[in-house]
Amino acid sequence: SVGIIGANGAGKSTLLLHMNGYLMPTSGTINIGDVYLTKKTQQAIRRKVGIVFQNPDDQLFMPTVYEDVAFGPLNLDLEDNVVQERVASALHAVNCYELRDKPPHYLSCGQKSSVAIAAVMAVGPDILAMDEPAANLDPRSRRSLINLLNTFEHSKIIASHDLDLIMDVCQRCI
């Protein structure tokens, strides 16, 4: 896992958005593993790199938690039983399975953050890229998030001002 730190406006979020293909480079190249980011490879890159936005409200938009987490796998044209398994597994991993029928706008910020992580995990990316994952969390929710992130076997790239979180979760920092 790698932590990315820097001042406001230093480009941490922009870097993550480029890594996922939400932003395309105007010069130079971006490659994830041996895949160069182009319009043709953009979908493949997005399957490899899942991004969790700083504000979960920018990511959660469906009527229920279940539908939000299922959105990505459904767009991969997976069989219904595979989608159900992925959603259940991701929600269990973030301790939010009991919230599956709730509307996201009724959740706490910490719960929304966990559901946003589950939504990305359900797609099955190789890399989780997270932008300020502990922003707006109370100390208890922040500690729960750190514990959760430390259970993941995914490669993680975390952009944050929270140096303690970076030290607790990441092996390297740039």
Residue ranges and their predicted role:
Residues 81-99:
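Conserved ABC ATPase "signature" region
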Residues 103-107, 111:
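Conserved ABC ATPase signature
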Residues 160-161:
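H-loop/switch region of ABC-family ATPase nucleotide-binding domains
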Residues 20:
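Helix-to-loop junction immediately C-terminal to a conserved catalytic motif
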Residues 128-131:
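Catalytic Walker B motif of ABC-type/P-loop ATPase nucleotide-binding domains
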Residues 5-7:
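The feature captures the beta-strand-to-loop junction immediately N-terminal to the Walker
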Residues 28-36, 45:
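Conserved ABC transporter NBD signature motif
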